[in-house]
Amino acid sequence: MDENKQKALAAALGQIEKQFGKGSIMRLGDNRTMDVETISTGSLSLDIALGAGGLPMGRIVEVYGPESSGKTTLTLELIAAAQRVGKTCAFIDAEHALDPIYAKKLGVNIDELLVSQPDTGEQALEICDALARSGAIDVIVIDSVAALTPKAEIEGEMGDSHMGLQARMLSQAMRKLTGNLKQSNCMCIFINQIRMKIGVMFGNPETTTGGNALKFYASVRLDIRRTGSIKEGDEVVGNETRIKVVKNKIAAPFKQADTQILYGQGFNREGELVDLGVKHKLVEKAGAWYSYNGDKIGQGKANACKFLRENPAAAMALDTKLREMLLNPAELIVEEPILSEMPQEEEL
């Protein structure tokens, strides 16, 4: 670029920053735009599948799946992980179904968690937008999109038709929220439910509620499914769970994580450490015995998990080694939301 063009560009950049604030325009190679801050999901397998070590700050995330698949558990685990590193979290409980006792068991500090139980969908989204604009909140969870009922539907009669009302409400909210979340570096997680499309002969008949806007605006979309039961004798103590990364704007998508959710405990972290440790040769397995750093840690997986549970320093060291081995920052893709590509109201 010649000198006159450089001067003109510098003057234009200076004018833009003066008018709209510092950081309103920058070069893509600037380090500030390349760093993606993430928060652990509480599951090592999922953090690795996401490629960045967790879910990204300043972005919209969608978690969806069938009933009782672990959607709320996943978000509560993330809230607990965020609180452990000093983040402030809010939970907008549109379903009016949050169990504080269960949240506490998962490690959530319920005394510090902000909770709202809004009456209408518009109220829920306004509260979310106000929290994001405050700059004081780091993580907002909305449970769930299906329960965000428009005011007109609540005030109307049973049987009234409100075609596309919720989709229009969400589309408008996404346009407002995206910029505010980015500026305040606040993550917003939408929990969503599954519905069936009628008359689909080929392809997947499943879809999520609330129209297409959320699909476009979300930087990460997670599909969580229960694949089996975990039994101790005849008693079912948890679920085998598979989480697919359906969309990912910060690393390679379409990876999946197989994990276990234990009732009343959340993710089976020690089980993940043992399985991944054996797979990547950090934990040795000879017959039924497991060894770590040359020392036997248990006969059978249950005893190996018990050892790691009772020795958090060893568990943390193994977790750190696995993250260093399996998370490659060079693979990260930083893709900012492009407003011109977002769906407008007629595309709902």
UniProtKB/Swiss-Prot annotation:
Entries under NCBIfam families matching the protein: tigrfam_recA (TIGR02012)
Keywords: ATP-binding, Cytoplasm, DNA damage, DNA recombination, DNA repair, DNA-binding, Nucleotide-binding, SOS response
UniProt cross-references to InterPro entries, sorted A to Z: AAA+_ATPase, DNA_recomb/repair_RecA, DNA_recomb/repair_RecA_CS, P-loop_NTPase, RecA-like_C, RecA-like_N, RecA_ATP-bd, RecA_C_sf
SMART domains on file: AAA
Protein family membership: Belongs to the RecA family.
Record function comment: Can catalyze the hydrolysis of ATP in the presence of single-stranded DNA, the ATP-dependent uptake of single-stranded DNA by duplex DNA, and the ATP-dependent hybridization of homologous single-stranded DNAs. It interacts with LexA causing its activation and leading to its autocatalytic cleavage.
Gene that this sequence comes from: recA
Biological process annotations from GO: DNA recombination; DNA repair; SOS response
GO cellular component, one term: cytosol
Organism this protein belongs to: Vibrio anguillarum (strain ATCC 68554 / 775)
GO MF annotations in UniProt: ATP binding; ATP hydrolysis activity; ATP-dependent DNA damage sensor activity; damaged DNA binding; single-stranded DNA binding
Full protein name: Protein RecA
